[in-house]
């Protein structure tokens, strides 16, 4: 990708038909100039909160805000280490908030961050918020869920078809917050 290439950016989150509140959050931080893009890239972060009502909403908002803030402050680190550290910082922040107040106990969120860089893309991923690439009319899943079903398939203990029918699909094995 060249700086002159067109990049259309947008974001939308919808509560859907089954829930009364939306626990999704996202941040889009496009580099303001070519120098910033070459040095740190464009950052896209999504999160899907877990926990009762406002607790999940708060966790997802904390995740996207913290990851974006930390990543751009960690300019002394190489990009791969900076995005990992930013996710770790978000995890600690959410965990500390969850343990400091009984009402926030167990708060957590899934999150996926994508860095779009001159040399390609990089993904940091926790949970079941997926990253996809759409190219030439094809959709390709780039991340795989940290869920019980996917873990069993990855370990070859179940086929994909068995996992879809035998294992609850909403049991995630990794998230930001609950375990620090």
Which stretches of residues belong to each language-model region?
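PP2C/PPM-type serine/threonine phosphatase catalytic domain
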Residues: 1-180
